[in-house]
């Protein structure tokens, strides 16, 4: 009996030792001093608009708290950027982190990595950014990017022309806008426009015409992706009315609208915030401000067009890439990025902040403030100008350009948009968009 007890004791002892050894071996993977040291991680980041000097300042700060992560920023050219991005990621190369437009999500659904819940909860994301971010930057209810700024349309107005006409404030409704545009227009004896009340009504020489028309369709309750409805036709009729007949306030003999506004020959002009930089550089003495967009009666609706940072679905360092993308969207970094951007030659301000809690920092700015005030009410559609995507936006814009020209040539808006709708349906199907 004693021998059996001793053997049993040995077996128990060996079992305990075995369990302990196994535990040590299994835990070696998680204990730093027992695991194999990992080398530094290198991430490639593609951007479009910010200079390497600006981004490198942010990268250097990040590296101080993440010394094992190296980030190489490459500023790409906008032309054929979207196609190059898709092709390289499809081939297993390309960047880990990349900039993309808010309307590109349907085209990049294979390339964008869904954000893990551990990075940020959907509730925190929704509470942090303007509502349009959650609307635009998701695929099947999964978040795929962090907005790096916010932009849209603002109503630029020439202070001197307003003062000369006795108008003391910018219009807040489209009714006021129409009345002011007529009052601000100056023509010569032959009926030629010398000072345009508003740069509006044509596709050929109205920069950002598609954004303006898209805004009007959304405000009127139409569907920019399927503009067969009466609301869309009414919006197109209203848009083109500014160039028609004896009461026109703009026409196709005028220079391109940004150039005309910069030259002081237009009272009101619509554009994104970055156009203010072009205008100030072209004419530093021009006195102008930017107001929130005119509205119809009812719910307020504005327009968004902005850029975000996403992570490649093929990245081998997704954890580190998402961590940096989140870092780029923190309050401190956005504020510093804004300040660093202003240091670039010809820049007077940075990107408007995409976060709700930072709105008060820019709300009183005579240029940026209007965009921040409009941001909570923004909608969007794939007809945003200047994305240079050769895809959804550029092709849908062409369909709307043709429809606008047809109406200016005396065609019916409903008929013109029926043709456009057929083209838009094909374009959406080609890129797998809804």
Regions found by a protein language model. Name each.
Residues 163, 377-434:
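Conserved C-terminal helix/tail region of periplasmic/extracytoplasmic solute-binding proteins
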Residues 39-50, 69-74, 96-97, 198, ...:
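Short, well-ordered beta-strand elements
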Residues 103-106, 278-285, 297-398:
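C-terminal lobe and pocket-closing loops
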Residues 61-132, 136-138, 163-172, 267-268, ...:
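Extracytoplasmic "Venus flytrap"/periplasmic binding protein-like
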Residues 101-153, 178, 194-195, 209, ...:
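Hinge/lid segment of periplasmic solute-binding proteins
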Residues 142-148, 153, 175-225, 266:
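Extracytoplasmic/periplasmic solute-binding protein
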Residues 180-185, 223-251, 293:
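Glycine-centered hinge/linker elements that transmit conformational signals in sensory
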Residues 1-44, 64, 422-434:
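Short, low-complexity disordered leader/linker segments with a strong preference
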